[in-house]
């Protein structure tokens, strides 16, 4: 097995959960109610937290990648919709990398080559999922 080493660092992370909760005995589940929150809302809140944790601003980012199992829609891609919310007016590229459950790992691997090759210095990867809208919307 070949070992490949990358020279990159995860500077920060952020999370966001839906406001609506459902409790089953001793477990709490979070779900998005249609019309109240969106996948883009959750992504924007997670990005805000990640940038704060890293001590960065959106203007420090060279590329925005959405790495989710299910995107909001095919065209424009989810990353473009997130870009519109968190990076409006900035000219950084935005792209989706979707490999279902492994999207984040695939995105991290892919952007590591772009960073190593000098194309980008700081890439923001965000994964946002809203399974509750498709699994039991009522």
Where are these regions (language model features)?
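Conserved beta-strand-centric core segments of catalytic alpha/beta enzyme folds
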Residues: 1-24, 108-138
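Conserved "HGTGT" condensation-loop signature of ketosynthase/thiolase-family condensing enzymes
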Residues: 1-65, 86-87
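Conserved catalytic cysteine-centered active-site region
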Residues: 34-37, 68-122
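A short linear-motif detector with a strong N-terminal bias
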Residues: 43-44, 75, 103-104, 130-134
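A general secondary-structure junction signal
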Residues: 65-68, 127
């Amino acid at each position: 097995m070949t070992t490949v080493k990358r020279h990159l660092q995860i500077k920060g992370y952020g999370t966001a959960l839906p406001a609506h909760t459902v409790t089953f005995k001793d477990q709490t589940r979070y779900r998005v109610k249609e019309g109240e929150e969106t996948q883009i809302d959750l992504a924007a809140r997670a990005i805000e937290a990640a940038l704060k944790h890293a001590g960065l601003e959106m203007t420090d980012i060279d590329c925005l990648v959405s790495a989710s199992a299910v995107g909001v829609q095919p065209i424009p891609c989810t990353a473009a919709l997130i870009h519109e919310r968190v990076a409006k007016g900035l000219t950084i590229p935005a792209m989706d990398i979707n490999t279902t459950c492994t999207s984040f790992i695939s995105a991290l691997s892919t952007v590591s080559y772009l960073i190593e090759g000098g194309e980008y210095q700081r890439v923001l990867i965000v994964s946002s999922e809203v399974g509750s809208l498709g699994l039991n919307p009522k």
